[in-house]
């Protein structure tokens, strides 16, 4: 058996169906989805893993759960939760799942069941219509959902309230340009982590956290961190540079990787290199008659 060189890498792009579904969904969604920091990172190393890590770790289908819940939050235009009544096939198309009318719809149903069991959503059955999904608080405690911007304004005089309701904003182009669909769960997780790290800073701000920080703050493994950063670089959302830690000291210079988010890239349709497949050629065994 002889292994040939890997085939040329092909570009994985969102399907036309997914892009059209995102454009249709944008009529109901916010210009920028709001997501609390507490969904992405824990405030203390001894706290349980944050909801983001729990979704990814919770068995098969983690990335579908994460992408689906983020999409639910995107479509919350009001300050309080608004019920969403769309068929599972529509959500499967938005997430660009295979066979959206059958297998994809079942994957959405499985994700909804997990999200309801873990108190991120409430599902209301409706006779003759798709089930209604009611979003609950990002903490997974079953509390009623209030948009973080509105909650922060309500508790403006409370320092504790301002901290609890700190949030990042995810541009609608994350959906309409197909980035949600082409990134894996690791890629989406690291995008959210970098958004939290960046805060309101400009795109020129250098971002850095160590593998230990990925686990301590975000509950993400080194594999997830490295895979996610690699994907973000491939789609052009992140530029990574090596920067000296002590450039002015008379010591051995140590360097580390720093990352720069480029949110302007969201204005372009997403594309990521698919993993190359190895083509294996099996040599035909000679029979006794064929032998020289």
How should these model regions be labeled?
Residues 137-178, 256-292:
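Short, amphipathic alpha-helical interaction segments positioned at domain boundaries
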